């Protein structure tokens, strides 16, 4: 899919780019698969900000996505490829032979009229979902489960894909988009192909207002705050931060400080970390 620019009617429009959405076939979602979303503004039940930089944005409905793909051996026909405001990837509306409708993450190359199937006996074809045990080594996959039957949790955003590197016993080795190689049980399911909307990463937002439409509020530098708001705040004019190294708003070391727990259960499943050369 291509990326289009705009005439420079304003300085920000000069740099702004947008997807052309050529793959999208309809602008009307399936009503039976919509759920209302209530905005939190980043606040918890007590009204306190627990996540910064969240607020405003256009209204949106949540599209219920089938991440489990557990309707085995029943073919489903792709009816439409749609835009989803809740994720970077496009979604596909599929209708099963028994009449049930579901949304799934659309992979690259999936078109209206195509047929997809789930189950251990499915063909190795784009959009089909099957256990890793039945997928050949070297296959490009996405929508990967971490626990059998739980639903896909890995490799779901636009343009992403993982590769099946090896299979041994009850576990397989999968190389994730970050470069991390991880053990995943062979009973876990994955979908064949690459996630759609590959040009998403080269889109230039261009202006602050477009980010506000997405529900993202400004990020203020700590050095321009007051000392009671941030460890970098205070001083006359452009002052140094007053610390040997940068700090987070809560006083913890920033920039390079490892935040992952030292003794995490899932450490045993990581074969190669993403930072290892």
From Swiss-Prot:
It comes from the Bacteria. The keyword Ribonucleoprotein applies. GO terms for cellular component: large ribosomal subunit. InterPro entries: NA-bd_OB-fold, Rib_uL2_dom2, Ribosomal_uL2, Ribosomal_uL2_bac/org-type, Ribosomal_uL2_C, Ribosomal_uL2_CS, Ribosomal_uL2_dom3, Ribosomal_uL2_RNA-bd_dom. One of its GO terms (biological process) is cytoplasmic translation. It holds the Pfam family Ribosomal_L2_C. Gene3D superfamilies: 2.30.30.30, Nucleic acid-binding proteins, Ribosomal protein L2, domain 3. SMART domains: Ribosomal_L2, Ribosomal_L2_C. Keywords: Ribonucleoprotein, Ribosomal protein, RNA-binding, rRNA-binding. One of its GO terms (molecular function) is rRNA binding. Residues 219-277 are annotated as: Disordered. Part of the 50S ribosomal subunit. Forms a bridge to the 30S subunit in the 70S ribosome. Belongs to the universal ribosomal protein uL2 family. One of the primary rRNA binding proteins. Required for association of the 30S and 50S subunits to form the 70S ribosome, for tRNA binding and peptide bond formation. It has been suggested to have peptidyltransferase activity; this is somewhat controversial. Makes several contacts with the 16S rRNA in the 70S ribosome. This is Large ribosomal subunit protein uL2. It comes from Clostridium botulinum (strain Okra / Type B1). The gene is rplB.
């Amino acid at each position: 899919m291509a990326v289009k620019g705009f005439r420079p009617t304003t300085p920000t429009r000069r740099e702004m780019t947008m997807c052309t959405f050529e793959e999208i076939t309809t602008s009307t979602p399936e009503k039976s698969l919509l759920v209302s979303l209530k905005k939190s503004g980043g606040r918890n039940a007590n009204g306190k900000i627990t996540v910064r930089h969240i607020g405003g944005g256009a209204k949106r409905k949540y599209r219920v996505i089938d991440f489990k793909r557990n309707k085995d051996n029943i073919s489903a026909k792709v009816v439409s490829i749609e835009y989803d405001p809740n994720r970077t990837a496009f979604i596909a509306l599929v209708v099963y032979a028994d009449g049930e409708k579901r949304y799934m993450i659309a992979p690259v190359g999936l078109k209206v009229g195509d047929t997809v199937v789930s189950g251990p006996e499915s063909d190795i074809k784009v959009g089909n979902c099957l256990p890793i045990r039945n997928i050949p080594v070297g296959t490009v996959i996405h929508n990967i489960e971490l626990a059998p039957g739980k639903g896909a949790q890995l490799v779901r955003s636009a343009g992403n894909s993982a590769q099946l590197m090896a299979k041994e016993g009850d576990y397989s080795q999968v190389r994730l988009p970050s470069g991390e190689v991880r053990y995943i049980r062979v009973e876990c399911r994955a979908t064949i192909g690459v996630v759609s909307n590959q040009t998403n990463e080269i889109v230039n937002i261009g202006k602050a207002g477009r980010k506000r439409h997405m529900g993202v509020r400004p990020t203020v530098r700590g050095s321009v705050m007051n000392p009671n708001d941030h460890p970098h705040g205070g001083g006359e004019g452009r002052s140094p931060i007053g610390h040997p190294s940068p700090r987070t708003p809560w006083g913890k070391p920033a920039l390079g400080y490892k935040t992952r727990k030292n003794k995490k259960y899932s450490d045993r499943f990581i074969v190669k970390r993403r930072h290892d050369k």
